[in-house]
């Protein structure tokens, strides 16, 4: 799903802006809304979500959120563009929760699969989660060996691995032979 205008869960499912309290569920509302087809040409397609009175009641800003997908051989590029159509500064965050089959080929056991974190070689900072979905800062770090982490049972159970700032520009899932079968690049 697309996470907009919030990434994460606000405390008590609400936030304050200019002295007023607004309701907001985990990761905002875009993931629960229907986007309109904006354009389709060749191997590209664009969708748009425009603010409504319903969104304005939760998020007091007028906007247009454009999401484009382009297919090029075995690669899919995703592009986000946010237009502030209001007359005031607009505060937002945007993110995604892509999901990939692991292990590949319907195998049952993830043992031996790894994650490679691009040019990051030693460790990745990560966050814990509260039961209601809020990310909490921890001092924990995922130790990497030559930029890789072994996926073990329970690897994703207790925390969220967030790639933030300039920690790395790509993450790959490696099969048991060490071959990347999915790579996500971002900038």
Q: What function would you assign to each model-found segment?
A:
Residues 51-98, 104:
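Acidic, contiguous internal or C-terminal segments within carbohydrate-active enzymes
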Residues 11, 33, 65-67, 169, ...:
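Residue-level marker for the onset of beta-strands and adjacent loop->beta junctions
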Residues 16, 38-39, 70, 83, ...:
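Well-ordered beta-strand positions
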Residues 20-73:
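Extended, loop-rich substrate-binding clefts of extracytoplasmic carbohydrate-active enzymes
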Residues 44-48, 66-68, 77-81, 114-116, ...:
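Beta-strand secondary-structure signal
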């Amino acid at each position: 799903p697309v996470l907009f205008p919030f990434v994460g869960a606000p405390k008590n499912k609400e936030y304050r802006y200019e002295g007023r309290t607004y309701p907001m569920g985990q990761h905002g509302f875009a993931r629960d809304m229907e986007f309109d087809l904006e354009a389709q040409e060749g191997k590209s397609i664009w969708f748009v979500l425009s603010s409504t009175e319903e969104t304005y009641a939760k998020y007091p800003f007028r906007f247009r959120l454009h999401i484009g997908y382009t297919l090029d051989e075995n690669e899919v590029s995703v592009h986000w563009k946010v237009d502030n159509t209001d007359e005031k500064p607009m505060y937002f965050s945007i993110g995604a929760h892509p999901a990939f089959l692991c292990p590949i080929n319907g195998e049952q056991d993830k043992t031996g699969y790894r994650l490679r974190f691009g040019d990051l070689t030693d460790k990745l900072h990560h966050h814990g989660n509260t039961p209601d979905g809020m990310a909490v800062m921890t001092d924990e770090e995922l130790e990497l060996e030559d930029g890789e982490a072994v996926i073990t049972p329970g690897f994703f159970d207790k925390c969220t691995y967030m790639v933030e700032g300039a920690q790395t520009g790509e993450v790959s899932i490696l099969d048991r032979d060490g071959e990347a079968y999915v790579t996500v690049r971002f900038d």
